[in-house]
Structure formats: structure tokens, C-alpha cells
């Protein structure tokens, strides 16, 4: 394990403008190479947690460190460099539907190019080859020139995973990556995330609705209820009753572990 956490949250709270508490007093350390699943009811704060780590949401108090550097107050170039190390995978795939699969995967390299080059699709031959190889790794090399909106939901999510592979981040934040997929396709997508974790050493934090997928793929499980961490432990040491408590445990007045 690394001496410093890859992700660290210190006393993090998020209160929305309407007064809704998104996160409350979160303290977490996630080390390099971990595969962490976050579980909880819809509205519990799972998405807020992930989006705060990448600073898609600004937190109300506390601090978030990425590989030892604060993202909370980072600006300009420093913020861009920190975000370059964080790949995001969303439940709605977040692809440019009318663009080719290849172009969507190349988006993973945008942070490494000046804006004018990406606007005119001026990617290097080397990066185009890397994009093709990334598609090979998720078994979509035959779709390289297809439009993204011609693909099935599962194929689109695998394009999103290839895009993250192209970005080569230290961290992958997957926000309900299987929510709109059938069970068989969900397992395929989770296996792709497992590949990125085990083969490339990327730290994965995934929000999941499915307890079965969480148990199958997670090495560590974090339970969120009403914006608080109510459980944090190794999956192999976590009895099924814990999941029942997380989903049926009331209003989340338990303190964070």
C-alpha cells in the first residue's frame, strides 16, 4: 500500500442551496489500487460523494485530497491536472452520440492537447492507434467507425470504459455504471472495470445499486445513508445483514465509522 492515500476526505460536508444535506462529516481514506464499492439507497449521497471527489460539485466544508494534493481549492492548471488523473464513468454513458466510436475514445486524451487541436480532431497517429487498442481490450474493435448511437447500451458503456483507458487516470469514479443494463451486460462491464483495476493498477470507486454485483466485484464496501458513512469494511468480512441495515436502517442517524 502507498504511504499516502490516493483519495482522502477530511470532515467533508455538502449542503445544497435549498438546505438539503448531501454529505455530512465524511472521513475516508482510499489507497492506490483498491476496488471500492459504495452502496446505499437512491438519494443517500452516493453520487454526491463521487462528484465531490472530482469537484463536479463543490463541497461546503472540509477538504478532499487526490494523491496528497487538495482538489478543494485547486484552480486553473492545477485543477485540470488533478482532474486528468480522475476518469469518470456515468450511468448515461456520456458519449457524443453522433460521433464515431473512435472519436469518443479519443476524447480521453483531450486534457493532453490544446483546445484548437481537439476541435479540429488533430490527434496524433500514436493516439489513434492507442484508441484502437483500447477498443480491442473491451472487444469493440469492429465498431471503431460506427456512430455511438448505433450501439447497444452495454456497448456504449464499454466505449466509455475504453475512453477512460485512453485517459490513463490514477482513479476511476463509476457512478451507477450498470444502472441501465441487463444482468449479463452488467457483469461484462464490471469485468472491464476489474481489468482496469488489476491490470493497470487504477483505483476504482463504483456506486452500485446491485448488492450481488457489489459482493462479486468489490474488495471493500462503503455504506452511505442520509449523507453519512454508516459502514466501511472488507467485503469478505461483511455479512449480508450489513446490507439490510444499510438499506433499511432508518434515517441515517448513525455516526460515520
From Swiss-Prot:
Subunit structure: The complex is composed of two ATP-binding proteins (PhnC), two transmembrane proteins (PhnE) and a solute-binding protein (PhnD).
Membrane topology recorded in Swiss-Prot or TrEMBL: Peripheral membrane protein
Gene (UniProt): phnC
Domain ABC transporter: 7-251
Species name: Lactobacillus acidophilus (strain ATCC 700396 / NCK56 / N2 / NCFM)
Keywords: ATP-binding, Cell membrane, Membrane, Nucleotide-binding, Phosphonate transport, Translocase, Transport
Main location as per UniProt: membrane
Membrane in keyword set: yes
EC number in record: 7.3.2.2
Family membership noted in the UniProt record: Belongs to the ABC transporter superfamily. Phosphonates importer (TC 3.A.1.9.1) family.
GO MF entries: ABC-type phosphonate transporter activity; ATP binding; ATP hydrolysis activity
Positions bound to ATP: 40-47
Protein name: Phosphonates import ATP-binding protein PhnC
Any one of the GO CC terms: plasma membrane
Covalent S-S links between cysteines: none
Protein localization: Cell membrane
Top-rank taxon, per record: Bacteria
Reactions catalysed according to its record: phosphonate(out) + ATP + H2O = phosphonate(in) + ADP + phosphate + H(+)
Gene3D superfamilies named among the record's database cross-references: P-loop containing nucleotide triphosphate hydrolases
NCBIfam families: ABC_phnC (TIGR02315)
Amino acid at each position: 500500500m502507498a504511504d499516502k492515500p490516493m483519495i482522502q476526505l477530511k470532515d467533508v460536508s455538502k449542503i445544497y442551496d435549498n438546505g438539503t444535506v448531501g454529505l455530512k462529516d465524511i472521513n475516508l481514506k482510499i489507497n492506490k489500487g483498491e476496488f471500492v464499492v459504495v452502496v446505499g439507497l437512491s438519494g443517500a449521497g452516493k453520487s454526491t460523494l463521487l462528484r465531490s471527489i472530482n469537484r463536479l460539485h463543490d463541497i461546503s466544508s472540509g477538504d478532499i485530497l487526490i494523491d496528497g494534493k487538495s482538489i478543494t481549492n485547486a484552480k486553473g492548471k492545477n485543477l485540470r491536472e488533478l482532474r486528468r488523473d480522475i476518469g469518470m464513468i456515468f450511468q448515461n454513458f456520456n458519449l457524443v452520440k453522433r460521433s464515431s466510436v473512435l472519436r469518443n475514445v479519443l476524447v480521453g486524451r483531450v486534457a493532453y492537447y490544446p483546445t484548437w487541436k481537439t476541435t479540429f480532431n488533430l490527434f496524433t497517429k500514436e493516439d489513434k492507434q492507442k484508441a484502437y487498442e483500447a477498443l480491442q481490450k473491451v472487444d469493440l474493435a469492429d465498431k471503431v467507425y460506427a456512430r455511438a448511437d448505433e450501439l447497444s447500451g452495454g456497448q456504449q458503456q464499454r466505449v466509455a470504459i475504453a475512453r477512460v483507458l485512453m485517459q490513463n487516470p490514477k482513479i476511476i469514479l463509476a457512478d451507477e455504471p450498470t444502472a441501465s443494463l441487463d444482468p449479463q451486460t452488467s457483469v461484462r462491464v464490471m469485468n472491464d472495470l476489474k481489468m482496469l483495476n488489476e491490470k493497470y493498477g487504477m483505483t476504482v470507486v463504483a456506486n452500485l445499486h446491485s448488492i450481488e454485483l457489489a459482493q462479486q466485484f468489490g474488495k471493500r464496501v462503503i455504506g452511505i445513508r442520509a449523507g453519512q458513512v454508516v459502514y466501511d469494511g472488507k467485503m469478505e468480512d461483511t455479512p449480508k445483514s450489513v446490507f439490510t441495515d444499510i438499506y433499511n436502517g432508518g434515517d441515517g442517524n448513525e455516526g460515520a465509522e
